[in-house]
């Protein structure tokens, strides 16, 4: 069952209230570190922003506003009240809640322009008691009224004025003169009206399954959680929602690999920790973590998210736990940091030296005292065919029955190619991937088109390469097999991993590629932007075409992807869980072709199987205890 998370028209954040003069300078400033901001209406049905610190409150009647939302992903936004010349700077607000709040404010304000305001004389003589009523949720009619007013404004002659370059809540750009001052000191009382206001839509609802909602609520209760689940159960999506529900200043989203970190808008666990590989002595690691910049990570962190935990080595996890206690000066597990850990130990294991034995995190000394609760997502979303889901579950547990082997062997003859789009080959070794893609591209006739990325800091290109899913340079030709590296339009099937072929290039100085996708959509692919955190908490970005060559891709790089048509060679599988990760990338059995299959490559680590068996046993005991308690209560 899917549940739509109801986001409230109230947010909790830090806020700075600035009273500006006509030049945009702050005459008076008030900072509230922990504020509650509510959207509602007063006795005259005016739109009102109520700001409270828990003791005192201040109401701001909204007449004209400007919204600045460029840094909304970081939990920051600004509301400028005109003509009062008051600026509200919101920060450290959970991103999902802030997006919903700002979208609601925008729609309600635009829709309200249709209503005739109450004049001052009527207000003075009304005798109505003061009141504040929380705003009702956005309805379809609000959006229709807002768009009606926008259409009317668009039909008028646009007026240009000075102001900030601004990206609005709904994605509209304002292209004005660039200012040299900071946002907090800008004069925002200009006769600014965008040349064309974009059409508004309903605020996006966050849809979670019952299982996912339970995990999210457990996280918000402050408990240390490890949640797991097989491939395609929505772990990454849930992690993004968890990131969006926590205060940004004290939340650090990390993952064992750069690509996984990029998917959740975070950084690598090693970059956050600042202790290198962790092979040094504990004393040396503590000294490394106490360096300026690194220490600030540890001391400001209240919520640490770790994705792809299966690839984190157990001894490294233990060392992090000890470092956290030492640097933070607290004896609680992990120095009192809330841990939100995600992954599937039945997928890819930690990368270790050939001579070393794999040690998973759950085998570490600190795991049990750090993790309060283990939860499992069981509802598979990537695949809908119950037979294929059952086959994958058997492979995940290292079981390859005669029936499973027969079905996989039959895929050898599957014709997964369609409309000139070939199957992507999943390879166990990344060297094979590069050789295959380069060779197949060179074999194509015609002119090669090169696309260089625009990086925020060319000096840190190695860091960007490690975290960004697309290369610094992309070479394409007509007929090149490609896949999307980012969700562009989920409703049209343009999702991360969607397969396509380059059919032509747009004429002009940019020569943008035109791609026909397997889902039936033909699209001009334009550069997109990835933003992620580097060392020291600095933000890095790359602007590049969201495309990758797709004749081949490594199993490691495919983790978290859903592929339309895939060919797998399992003869060189060398790790437990690798065959499962590869096979579970396919959306269905019809889009899968397995070459040189050997049942011996299907294996699961026995220690991991034991861990999951124990986990399910403990969960069954908890459920039995809960049922007994409820039975007694109902007697």
Curated annotation (Swiss-Prot):
Its EC number is 5.6.2.3. It catalyses: Couples ATP hydrolysis with the unwinding of duplex DNA at the replication fork by translocating in the 5'-3' direction. This creates two antiparallel DNA single strands (ssDNA). The leading ssDNA polymer is the template for DNA polymerase III holoenzyme which synthesizes a continuous strand; ATP + H2O = ADP + phosphate + H(+). GO terms for biological process: DNA recombination; DNA repair; mitochondrial genome maintenance; telomere maintenance. It is found in: Nucleus; Mitochondrion. Keywords: ATP-binding, DNA damage, DNA recombination, DNA repair, DNA-binding, Helicase, Hydrolase, Isomerase, Mitochondrion, Nucleotide-binding, Nucleus. GO terms for molecular function: 5'-3' DNA helicase activity; ATP binding; ATP hydrolysis activity; DNA binding. Its cofactor is Mg(2+). Residues 578-597 bind DNA. ATP binds at residues 229-236. Pfam families: PH_LRR1, PIF1, Pif1_2B_dom. Its main location: nucleus. InterPro entries: AAA+_ATPase, DNA_helicase_pif1-like_DEAD, P-loop_NTPase, Pif1-like_2B_dom, PIF1_helicase, PIF1_RRM3_pfh1. Residues 150-187 are annotated as: Disordered. SUPFAM superfamilies: P-loop containing nucleoside triphosphate hydrolases. DNA-dependent ATPase and 5'-3' DNA helicase required for the maintenance of both mitochondrial and nuclear genome stability. HAMAP family: PIF1. Monomer. PANTHER family: ATP-DEPENDENT DNA HELICASE, ATP-DEPENDENT DNA HELICASE PIF1. Belongs to the helicase family. PIF1 subfamily. This is ATP-dependent DNA helicase PIF1. It comes from Xenopus laevis (African clawed frog).
